[in-house]
């Protein structure tokens, strides 16, 4: 990729007198501190930009955007666009020629007497950088002969200038930015752009003896024309522009941070989170006992006839079925390796995680430019479980595990000593940079964290967006998202995948056919074409028998307790899930006050990682035990119980819960469903899946759960969602993509696409206690708090 950077001195000769940053002892005077020139900072940013583009193969994405967005633009027009794009980096800090910035921030009076902005702008520089960018490129755009190309390139010039203006803050609304250039009489939005424009006019007249050739301000009719061009009527095109702007903003912020840290702290970034060589990882993976068994089966047995598999005993056939699905998925992937969206739908307990791990490695091995893997899970417990599994798979080999990082709110930032052997300030600065920009080849994280990267408008949300380029994304349990967002999610995922060259594997035991919600006719690939034959195999369909007898009576905790006491006599492992934490705690207290001949345990979302691990260890050792839990038990908790009780909610949740029962297929499992708490009161996000007609309160839903025919269930759900999105209200999907996504209303998109509606006011309360981790290791809360205070 040939990057042509503009010489800043040809744009503004005064840059040679300007500084960008200062460092040194804060006790020294401004004049005594070492300073980095504006040209030095700009060149360092350009160098980091070239490195990231090269290492992350970003040119592939840039070329794809040009193909998708400028389908009919001439080579001359494309070249001009590329110059505008790359020189966003060059221009981002040129506004530091502001004399007030130089004097206040740098102690530099070389520009004294030069045109100064008024107090509204003061010592700010980003907005001045944006108007200087516009002044430079609007003049040159006007020389483009083709009218349509001229208009399109002018639109992009404004968009690029907006990214420059916002590179020290959040991505706000593009419309508000344009309105800010209006005259002081315009009451719409702020007028910072107008003040910057007045400074530019004065600067050019007084310092350069020139006039501003092209006015920055666009009148309303011109703005409307621009928004019609950039948004159009195609949702895919709207996503392409939205994704491109986030990518360029992410790159701009990244190179600015890297260059600044390089100068201020001496931290030179050499790796940018890509998998340079996966052969050692695949080699270690294929040497595991499970993989060797699969490969031997592939040579000698695969594929087996379905009739033969049905006749085998349950305990004997389950591994054969898992292997068949593993190889089906692998072969289908190879046949459709050039596609972008893949669905992996397997029964609960079929080994989806291992299948997805193999698929991600196969993609890296076979697809040029793919160089990163994300594993995204709905809960932190699943993240914990899978990083533990990866440690077992790779035998905790340091060279492999160093490439894998957990990114969530619970796990500390990954520390990897390289050139910074001692834990100095430099060491921690690099740790922070790696975390902020996800500079890890393999990342395990949660839906919430990933969605912030995809859609969040705060600067910190967009930091790592460029890391999505040329990556494999494994999405676990997508049905756990709010169903009101499914249409928007699949539209975004398809657009992002095509633009950013992502391979997205969506996996679940209960997977909605999201293709029905999008107008994009490029179908996703079902990795297991004959999935029904697996779902209906007795080993999965009959592993756990659902019992609905308790639904026939008005349930109380006393009635439930009496029923559970009878099951205790069978000396089995019993799991009881409530959808209300209050009910779970009350029932646990009731059981502990009752004389029963087994130990009773409790787990909720408040249980720490350590507490959960201790509970899981106990469950594996005890033959007779009761575990009372909340929904936290549905996923990410590796347990195998004999008998289950569950308060009914979503059908997806019922299936997930049943996956905790009789996982080994060594006996017969049973789950008793009861109706105690209102699911509608628990799920307050309007999810129609908790409507009575879609729960096991209805016999047709009971039949679906028994036969695992979830396609019928989701067919009804999706039909309702499709009709809702066509309604003339705030849920209208066409309006959302055209008016908000297509017109770059970042805060509105962020608000709509967040996963959790948090309505509580939270306050952290730290309680001191002593944890006994082992016979030789204890953690004292008081000591931890004192260490924290000393930081």
Each model region followed by its residue ranges:
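Walker A/P-loop
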Residues: 337-360
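C-terminal helicase lobe and adjacent C-terminal extensions/tails of nucleic-acid helicase motors
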Residues: 497, 562-571, 577, 582-595, ...
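Interdomain hinge/linker at the junction between the two RecA-like core domains of SF2 helicases
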Residues: 510-567
